[in-house]
Each structure stands twice: as C-alpha cells, then as structure tokens.
Amino acid sequence: MPDRDRLQMARDAYGAYVSGDRRVIEELLSDDFTFYSPADVGIDRDRYFERCWPNAELIEDTEFVRLVQDGDEVVVTYESTKTDGHRFRNTEVLTFDGEKICKTEVYFGWNLE
C-alpha cells in the first residue's frame, strides 16, 4: 500500500493548476507519464507540459464533484472556473504506479457557462 493517499495526490494535482505551482505537478507525474484526450492521444510528459500546463494561467478555481479510488485508479470529475468567468466540467481517470501518476485519460466537453 502506498504511503501517500492517492485521493489527496489527485487533489494536489488539480490544486497545482489553481495555484500555478508547476513544481507540485512535476513531482506527482512519473517520468514515463502518458496523457490521453480526444485532442492529444498518448502524448508524453514533456509534450503534456508544453500543451496542457499553459492552461494553469486560465484556471481560477476548481471544485470536485467526484473523487473515487478503485485500485490503482482515481476517477475525478471537476468543475473549473476560468479567469474570464466561464466554467467547464471534465472527468479524468488518473492511473497510479506507486506514488506517481503514470497515465491520465481526459473526457471533456461540458461548458457550464
């Protein structure tokens, strides 16, 4: 059993986007991290930081709707508010290898406002 709570690690990962603290997310992702979404299928860690991390500047707040752990996976549904006031909802599946997130699958498309 990992020493760290995976649900808290998931919260910390999304919190990094709100705070803009890249160091936090860098520590949580494995070296062989892979990211999947309809827009980016199977990109590596470096490409993830190029494509996804800049969005941290646009995120003002994130509220969790669902956080469920099942074995090595944590399912997260969240609603985020952007700096322009628009809100959106995503669901993501985070896969862990020990105490690192090794894969993220993103399902998106819900604009709330």
Model-derived segments and spans:
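A beta-strand edge to alpha-helix "cap/lid" segment located at domain peripheries
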Residues: 2-5, 12, 18, 34-38, ...
